[in-house]
């Protein structure tokens, strides 16, 4: 009898792709991420017993665990095929423990790319779980839990409820805050430039030459008077070409993508957030349905700091380049890239799994975002294996009365890799365009047409963008490939940092929290300290350090800082100043301030109580518009009927004046940071109370949840959309008195009537007609009973109120624990 094998991966998409490559003897199932973790309700780390973590099955996954146990029991071998990194290794380790697998039965396999060849080879060469890799993840998890659960409550008490601190996120906020302080402290310095428009009389072509200096020394004019002196000193002296230099300049292609550089370039070129970039990259890695090919993993593993490319991939790129572009576009020798200092180099760089699957060829099978990101990865990889671009560079030295001017031009002579790809720049400034020069010769005279003196001022350092913050984190050793995107998302979600256009700046809240952290917990926000912690985690992964040694070394100083902070801040509460906006009050003209209320942040006049004007504040939400891929924005309005505020979510292009960009997507459902594992679109959750599990709203997806199954209270057909919005977002807010009374009357008796109907249903087989009739009778009975028995109605009302109060008390006690759990990954 043939042996039966079970393969466990994280997601259904990955399971589908791998299942296609394995035979009928293999059953592939998804764990849907972690199945066991530290509990949410408490610290989950036994500090008294040497920091022993207390793991437990994740609530809500009991059925899945039972299903996997059953499948594992009936299988001869269980292949744990989670992602090839620390987190993936830990998931496999937890699975092995949960499913009670011994070393003989449990086999660990990893796939750097999900192709038939790699999957087949990996299954043939399984290995044991790498305990060093698991321990590195445990150390990181326990460190983050200790910092998050013990430091966050202090922020709640001393600053504001709902705050959190983290080992990496707090450093990232400080980096943004420090940059803002640099900008505020910057003092601009005046300087001038002088250009001369010169004409070659032979060709009658005019070009621009830039002032360099005098008598071979560089001069940088500091004032307009100095420029005037230079012009006066030159007077009517002639301009003569004294030196011509012609060279071929070669430019090498960019390195292949790592996680960090992919996130940076996707931010610059595609306007994708780091989180969105990783979500789309995950889809491309796990597999996409391609016409004629089936489900195909399109790229290699996307969490990597390696620049290494396999020899097989280099050979495939060479064949493709020679076939499409010709011999001149391939370098004399194949390009191999060295690993950067500190890189773990466990995987290859990010590249297409099959370079022959061009973006244009599979465009019809991909979503817009998948296509753009795949094209970026494919182009960058191919360019990294191509010949240099060659530029014809000409520079001229021009003298006039001892004063020196320079003119230069650079023209593309051979496109090389630029035929496929060119890297974007971080800043907004455009590269200086060098115009063409006429055919100049040494000794020839030139005619002066005019001078162009220009005043300039030195500029402060630019604020960070998503891309430059990630680059700075990588350069300073803050975090690892798996933490860059979650960290940027976390500091934005916590409102420690906000986006001003594409630039990041600290909020007053971020400044206050960072100030507190710098004063009381200097190690937590110190870049060098955090970088050393990352290095220690790397030594755990390498098997050189025991993971609990890392925790012990850290905890002594942290516990001392925590105790000192509690004493020093006893009885104190730090005030967060209002953030002044550029919006003017429509009533009195003052600059409005940003405040937080029950419906979130809003703009208010600082002249309260004499001026009570307020207006909504548009806030960017996680996720993308399912219609056009634009950003989702949180907007508010006020009901004309009830004069109450309601919230809805719309595409950023809903107010666009450009008809080509305008998008009419809007919803009452709240967009989440999660993507549907089936179709890849942003998932949403119900506004207000109850049913908080994210769901897919894509009708074409098998995971689609219809509107009537999302937990909303069904409204009367005559109710306006505006009223529906109000109740959807503020289901827990007070409705009008009349509505409250009616709702209570109906609810009080509906419960009893429903039970009666239920009993009747058990004994009698009902048809659709009988069901409808029963519902009609129930409503009528409830209404009559509510009208006839006001005493019972009042009792029901009191009971409901008592329960609600008790629930609120319970919630308040556990709220801090829940929020503290949300530390960075």
Question: Model-flagged regions — what are they?
Answer:
Residues 158-162, 177-223, 269:
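C-terminal helical "lid" subdomain and adjoining coupling/linker elements of P-loop NTPases
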Residues 1-138, 150, 212-213, 221-224, ...:
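Intrinsically disordered, low-complexity regulatory segments
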Residues 17-21, 67, 90-98, 118-122, ...:
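Alpha-helical scaffold elements adjacent to nucleotide-binding pockets in ATP/GTP-utilizing enzyme cores
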Residues 140-151, 168, 198-200, 249-261, ...:
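Core structural elements
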Residues 261-273, 470-480:
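Short helix-coil junctions and helix-kink-helix linkers
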Residues 218-255, 444:
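Metal- or metallocofactor-binding catalytic centers and their adjacent structured scaffolds
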Residues 118-195, 247:
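C-terminal or mid-to-C-terminal helical accessory/interaction module adjacent to the motor/catalytic core
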Residues 2-6, 17, 152, 185, ...:
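Basic, low-complexity terminal or inter-domain segments flanking catalytic cores
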């Amino acid at each position: 009898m043939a042996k039966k094998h079970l393969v466990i991966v994280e997601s259904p998409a990955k399971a589908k792709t791998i299942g296609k490559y394995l035979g009928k003897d293999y059953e592939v199932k998804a764990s849907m991420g972690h199945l066991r973790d530290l509990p949410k309700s408490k610290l989950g780390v036994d500090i008294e017993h040497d920091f022993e973590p207390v793991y437990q099955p994740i609530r809500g996954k009991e059925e899945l665990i039972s299903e996997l146990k059953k499948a594992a029991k009936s299988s001869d071998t269980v292949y744990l095929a989670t992602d090839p990194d620390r987190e993936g290794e830990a998931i496999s380790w937890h699975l092995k423990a949960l499913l009670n697998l011994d070393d003989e039965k449990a086999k660990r396999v990893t796939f750097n790319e999900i192709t038939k060849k790699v999957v087949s080879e990996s299954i043939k060469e399984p290995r044991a779980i790498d305990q060093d890799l698991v321990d590195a993840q445990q150390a990181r998890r326990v460190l983050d839990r200790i910092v998050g659960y013990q430091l966050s409550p202090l922020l709640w008490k001393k600053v504001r409820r709902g705050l959190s601190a983290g080992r990496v996120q707090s450093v990232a906020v400080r980096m943004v805050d420090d940059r803002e302080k640099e900008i505020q402290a910057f003092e601009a310095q005046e300087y001038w430039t002088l250009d001369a428009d010169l004409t070659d009389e032979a060709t009658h072509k005019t070009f621009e030459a830039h002032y360099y200096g005098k008598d071979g020394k560089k001069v940088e004019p500091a004032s307009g008077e100095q420029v005037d002196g230079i012009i006066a000193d030159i007077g009517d002296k002639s301009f003569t070409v004294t030196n011509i230099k012609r060279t071929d300049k070669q430019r090498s292609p960019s390195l292949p993508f790592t996680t960090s550089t992919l996130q940076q370039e996707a931010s610059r070129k595609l306007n994708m957030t780091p989180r969105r970039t990783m979500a789309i990259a995950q889809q491309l890695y796990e597999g996409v349905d391609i016409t004629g090919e089936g489900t195909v993993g399109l790229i290699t593993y996307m969490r990597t700091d390696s620049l290494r490319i396999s020899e097989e991939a280099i050979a495939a790129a060479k064949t493709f380049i020679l076939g499409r572009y010709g011999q001149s576009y391939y370098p004399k020798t194949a390009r191999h890239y060295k690993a950067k200092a500190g890189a773990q180099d466990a995987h290859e760089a990010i590249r297409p799994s099959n370079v022959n699957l061009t973006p244009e060829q599979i465009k019809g099978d991909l979503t817009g975002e998948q296509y753009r990101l795949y094209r970026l990865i494919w182009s960058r990889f191919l360019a990294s294996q191509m010949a240099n671009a060659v530029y014809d560079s000409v520079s001229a030295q021009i003298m006039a009365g001892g004063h020196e001017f320079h003119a230069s031009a650079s023209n593309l002579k051979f496109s090389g890799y630029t035929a496929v790809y060119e890297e974007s720049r971080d800043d907004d400034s455009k590269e200086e365009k060098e115009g063409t020069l006429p055919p100049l010769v040494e000794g020839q005279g030139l005619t002066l047409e005019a001078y162009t003196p220009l005043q300039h001022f030195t500029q402060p350092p630019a604020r960070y963008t998503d891309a430059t913050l990630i680059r700075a984190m990588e350069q300073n050793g803050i975090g690892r490939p798996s933490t860059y995107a979650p960290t940027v998302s976390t500091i934005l979600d916590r409102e420690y940092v906000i986006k001003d256009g594409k630039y990041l700046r600290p909020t007053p809240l971020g400044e206050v929290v960072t100030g507190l952290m710098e004063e009381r917990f200097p190690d937590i926000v110190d870049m060098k300290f955090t970088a050393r912690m990352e290095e220690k985690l790397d030594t755990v992964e390498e098997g050189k350090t025991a993971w609990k040694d890392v925790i012990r070394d850290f905890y002594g100083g942290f516990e001392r800082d925590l105790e000192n902070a509690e004493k020093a801040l006893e009885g104190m509460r730090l005030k967060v100043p209002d953030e002044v906006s550029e919006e003017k009050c429509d009533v009195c003209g003052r600059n409005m301030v940003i405040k937080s209320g029950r419906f979130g942040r809003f703009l208010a006049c600082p002249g309260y109580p004499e001026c009570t004007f307020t207006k909504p504040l548009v806030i960017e939400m996680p996720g993308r518009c399912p219609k056009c891929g634009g950003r989702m924005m949180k907007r508010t309005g006020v009901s004309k009927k009830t004069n109450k505020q309601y919230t809805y979510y719309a595409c950023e292009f809903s107010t666009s004046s450009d008809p080509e960009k305008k998008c009419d997507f809007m919803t009452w459902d709240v967009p989440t940071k999660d993507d549907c594992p089936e179709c890849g679109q942003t998932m949403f959750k119900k506004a207000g109370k109850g049913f908080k599990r994210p769901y897919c709203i894509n009708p074409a997806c098998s995971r689609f949840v219809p509107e009537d199954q999302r937990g909303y209270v069904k409204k009367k057909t005559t109710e306006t959309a505006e009223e529906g919005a109000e109740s959807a977002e503020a289901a827990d807010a007070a409705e009008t008195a009349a509505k409250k009374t009616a709702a209570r009357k109906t609810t009080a008796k509906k419960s009893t009537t429903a039970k009666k109907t239920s009993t009747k249903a058990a004994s009698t087989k009902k048809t659709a007609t009988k069901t409808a009739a029963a519902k009609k009778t129930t409503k009528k009975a409830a209404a009559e009973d509510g009208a006839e028995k006001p005493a019972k109605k009042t009792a029901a009302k009191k009971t409901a109120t008592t329960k609600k109060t008790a629930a609120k008390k319970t919630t308040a006690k556990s709220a801090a624990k829940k929020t503290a759990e949300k530390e960075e990954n």
